[in-house]
UniProtKB/Swiss-Prot annotation:
Gene that encodes it: dinB
Subcellular location: Cytoplasm
PANTHER family: DNA POLYMERASE KAPPA, DNA REPAIR POLYMERASE UMUC / TRANSFERASE FAMILY MEMBER
A GO biological process held by the record: DNA-templated DNA replication
EC number from the UniProt entry: 2.7.7.7
Any Pfam family: IMS_HHH_1
Protein name as it appears in the record: DNA polymerase IV
Amino acid sequence: MRKIIHVDMDCFFAAVEMRDNPALRDIPIAIGGSRERRGVISTANYPARQFGVRSAMPTAMALKLCPHLTLLPGRFVAYKEASRHVRDIFSRYTSLIEPLSLDEAWLDVTDSPHCYGSATLIAREIRQTIFNELQLTASAGVAPVKFLAKIASDLNKPNGQYVITPADVPGFLKTLPLAKIPGVGKVSAAKLENMGLRTCGDIQQCDLAMLLKRFGKFGRVLWERSQGIDERDVNSERLRKSVGVERTLAEDIHEWSDCEAIIEHLYPELERRLAIVKPDLLIARQGVKLKFNDFQQTTQEHVWPQLNKEDLIITARKTWNERRGERGVRLVGLHVTLLDPQLERQLVLGL
C-alpha cells in the first residue's frame, strides 16, 4: 500500500505578505487585481475570509463584502522563492514530488526511511520544518491514494493535518460528498444530485455501465474514486502543457457584450495561473473556447508569443460571429499552450 502526502500551504500568497509585513497580520488582506480593471481575488487571508472574501471572487464584490479590505497586487518573485524553499524541504524526504502549483504538491513517501517510515510523522515534520525555516504554515493530508490525500489536506486547515489509513477508507468514502472529489464542479454536482447521487456511497450502489452511458469517461472516474481507486503515480516529471480558465454560465448568453465582459473577468485569473506555473515560460499559442446551448463547442487558437487580452477578445469576437449562429453560449474559456521546454531552449540558444 502506498503512502501519499498532499501538502497545501495556508493562504500562501497572503501568508508571505503577512510574514514580510507584520502590520498586515490582523487585518483583512487579499491579493488580486483592482476593481477598476475588473480584477479577481487570488488569495485572501483568514480575517478577510470571515467577511466572505474568497479566491476567484471579483474584486468589486470582495470590496462590497469587506470595504476596509487591503488589496495587494502580488509579488510573484517572493512567492516563487518561498515555493522553491518549500520544494527543497520536500526533497529532503523523497524524490517523488509532484507540484500542482506554487503552493501545493503530492509526495510519495512509501519507501522513505525517515521518521521510521511513518507518513504521518513525515508530514508533521515537514510542516514543522516549513514553519521553522520560512515562518509559514502548511496543512497536509495523508492517504493511500492521491485524491484522498488531497481531500484530507483540506480537512484540518489551517496548520493541521488529517490521516486516512487504509482501514479508514471504506467508512470515509461512504459519506463523502461527490462535490469533494477533485474534478466534480458545481454543474456536475448539481446534475448528480438531480439523479439522487450525493455521496460516494450512492455511487457505490450504481451500475458502472449506467455511469458510462450518462457521463462517458467521467463516469468511470466517478465510480473508481467512489471505490477508493486512484492508480495515478506521483509524477515527478509532470510537465504542464497548457493553462486555461473557463466559466460555465448559470444562464445562456446571446449578446457579444456579455461574452466580452466574461473575458474581461476571466483574463486576470488566466494571468495568475500562468504566473504560478512558470512566469518566464514562452507561449506557443493562445485561444478561446465557446460551448453552445446544444453542448457543441468550438475552439479557436493561433500562434502568439505572449499573453495578450486584446488579441483574445478579437479571436473570441471572430469565433462568436462565425460559429455561433443563433445558439446561446453556456461556457466561455481562455487558454494558452505552453512552448515545449526543449524547443524553448533551442529558441533561446539560437545557433
